[in-house]
Swiss-Prot record:
Pfam families: GTP1_OBG (PF01018), MMR_HSR1 (PF01926). Belongs to the TRAFAC class OBG-HflX-like GTPase superfamily. OBG GTPase family. Keywords: Cytoplasm, GTP-binding, Hydrolase, Magnesium, Metal-binding, Nucleotide-binding. An essential GTPase which binds GTP, GDP and possibly (p)ppGpp with moderate affinity, with high nucleotide exchange rates and a fairly low GTP hydrolysis rate. Plays a role in control of the cell cycle, stress response, ribosome biogenesis and in those bacteria that undergo differentiation, in morphogenesis control. Mg(2+) binds at S172, T192. This is GTPase Obg. Residues 159-355 form the OBG-type G domain. It comes from Wolinella succinogenes (strain ATCC 29543 / DSM 1740 / CCUG 13145 / JCM 31913 / LMG 7466 / NCTC 11488 / FDC 602W). GTP binds at residues 165-172, 190-194, 212-215, 280-283, 336-338. It is found in: Cytoplasm.
Amino acid sequence: MFVDNVDIYVSSGKGGAGAVSFRREKYVIQGGPDGGDGGKGGDLYFEVNANTDTLSKFKGAKHYRAKNGQPGMGRRMSGKSGEEMVIVVPPGTQVFDYESNELLLDLKEEGMRVKFLEGGKGGLGNYHFKNSVNQRPTYAQPGIAGEERHVRLELKLIADVGLVGFPNVGKSTLISTLSNARPEVANYEFTTLIPALGVVDVDEFSSFVMADIPGIIGGASEGKGLGLEFLRHIERTKTLLFVIDLSNYREPLEQFEILQKELSQFSPELSLRPFGIALSKVDALSKEEANEKIELFLKGIGLSSCQSNQYALSEALQNYIAPLESSIPAFVVPISSATHENIKPLKYLLHESVRRRG
């Protein structure tokens, strides 16, 4: 089960109490104080591990506690420190204060380990309280309480390219064609119910990560459909790929305008992200019908086709490739995942877009 939002309580350990103890040795009638200090409470850490990609294990387990420190002992022996608690999360996990919604940690990188809560200090044993007035103190410090917080964990997947489109426009088929991802693919809306990540191999030494999220529909910003709930998973991407269905009953320009509107209402910053456009399911139309729709779409967004063959694009279909200094949109390319038309050029175009943005 994919879970990307949970709230939990986290606590560091309490320090152990100092000991009240006196020397008890043969021939020592009234031994002095020898109570040891309590052990330190365990610290609580967050650690990033790429072997997990969901927060599902936190469902139902509400409280994570480090161990308390052990009490001190006689002969000035300190108590054992409490065992630390390490909470393992996937890359892209953010930790928020549950009440204030303040961002406390942004855990992006594999192997990252952050101390979040400090364990309480152990109390001092009665040995420390001996003085000229009080030779046999019967007081020792209690341990200091650990820290506790109520936090919300939110997962934002880390990908280079984010797919954006209406339901059933071919996003899942595209990511499974380009990458190692295997999302469910079917000819009905909302087949994709959870985000999917796929690694796209460009050549022996180059690759990038692509993220697919459930389709967005008009009114998503008011809570309709599923896509808006998962838009956070493409917030970290370097570039977006709008997937527009040429065979859809909605005209391509209408699809694009609705998607842009919903993105801007979710996040103005995301709506300004560099992007490319893939006009999908071109195999469902004749070349004449497809070119007519492509030309109409390009005109609608203020562009004209350039019939570029720089990336070995199909010569039978119109396209648009932006000059190097331009970034929005970087390209408009008709594709077919069924026949693989322009799929390899699309891979190179996306890789170039990612490479330009570091």
